[in-house]
Amino acid sequence: MYAENITNAVEIQDIRAREILDSRGNPTIEADVILADGSMGRAAAPSGASTGSREALELRDGDKSRYLGKGVTKAVANVNSQIRSALLESDATDQQGIDNILIELDGTANKDHLGANAMLAVSLATAKAAAISQNLPLHQYIANLRGQTSLTMPVPMMNILNGGEHADNTVDIQEFMIEPTGFSSFSEALRAGVEIFHSLKSVLKSQGLNTAVGDEGGFAPNLRTNEEAITVIMQAIEQAGYKAGKDIHLALDCAASEFYKNGQYILAGEGNKTFDSQGFSDYLVKLTEQYPIISIEDGLDESDWEGWAYLTSKLGKKVQLVGDDLFVTNPAILQEGIDKQIANAILIKFNQIGTLSETLDAIYLAKKNGYATVISHRSGETEDSTIADLAVGTAAGQIKTGSLCRSDRVAKYNQLLRIEQQVRASYRGGEEFIGLRG
């Protein structure tokens, strides 16, 4: 009888979804999962601006008379009807079982029936409800799902200067990031990032440059070249009292698919400077030789696997090469990359694949094969901080969650500060990176 009551306590009693707004003022979906014991989990789906063509489908209404076509009432209806009916009385602690039901109910390769946004909100809300029911912090509950015994605090990739699809400026590369590698705790690393962020504002102001921010909270000035963006960040690091290449390293997200046209990489902000695959790879190699860059994300187009092979041969032993649009958090595509020795790291975004279980599959496949894992936000975010718990609970090692302003970004950093206070989790700094390991 006692065991039966325990089982009943974690049964899903109700599921309800609604439209809310993301950080860009666009609708997204939020779901609540309520268990028999009263535990409730709540989660919201993020949304990307630069997206990979093989990502799972984000279901939008397409009704131009409402939210300019970006409404998600269809996704909400799918949760409140089909998904709710399928999951009522299911065991919320059986995450794999819950996600399998969602996948089977959708029945498509790219989640275009239910929508990856609808599925993800329910998948994450279920995990949160189960964690609350078991009186566990979410990061520990996630760790338990795959038997992760050692926890680590992630090194933050802080996007302090925005370009590309994340800003209305002349800079082609989408993200210029700092990585606090030379610190012994997450809180000290975060403090360094904040100080450099404020220092960068001062540097930009002193040069008469715009200090408005982009989608992810980084500054978005008009600059003549990508290299000029790196230069002002180097100045900010020095002005803040830190040493580039020792305390702080740099990272780039090229989002190269956004400026790849007809087999050419075209830097519109630099007078339509044009490269072929090898030429743009060599351009990136040169930047790593001139500046302390230890990570490059989406350095080439998602379809340019031959170019990726060349880039990996040139930099793969000393620079982290991250596949985002390349792998879209998809274990099958990642396995293809592993087999072909393409890149050496994967960016992990829940909504690219649509369920927590599939996300964990991608993380642990990467780990098994020596690929680094970077847990990531999207440019359209909410106050939901689940990715902070995912980063710690999987010992991913790195997190990418924007700049040091905008509450949708800072929410994740604040959650990591709370977790660091609660648990014994090491901060490995530079040891997380292929080019810095001792």
From Swiss-Prot:
Organism: Psychrobacter sp. (strain PRwf-1)
Listed HAMAP family: Enolase
CC cofactor: Mg(2+)
Regions annotated as coiled coil: none
GO molecular function: magnesium ion binding; phosphopyruvate hydratase activity
Protein name: Enolase
Source species taxonomy: Bacteria, Pseudomonadati, Pseudomonadota, Gammaproteobacteria, Moraxellales
Cellular component GO terms held in the UniProt record: cell surface; extracellular region; phosphopyruvate hydratase complex
Keywords: Cytoplasm, Glycolysis, Lyase, Magnesium, Metal-binding, Secreted
Function text: Catalyzes the reversible conversion of 2-phosphoglycerate (2-PG) into phosphoenolpyruvate (PEP). It is essential for the degradation of carbohydrates via glycolysis.
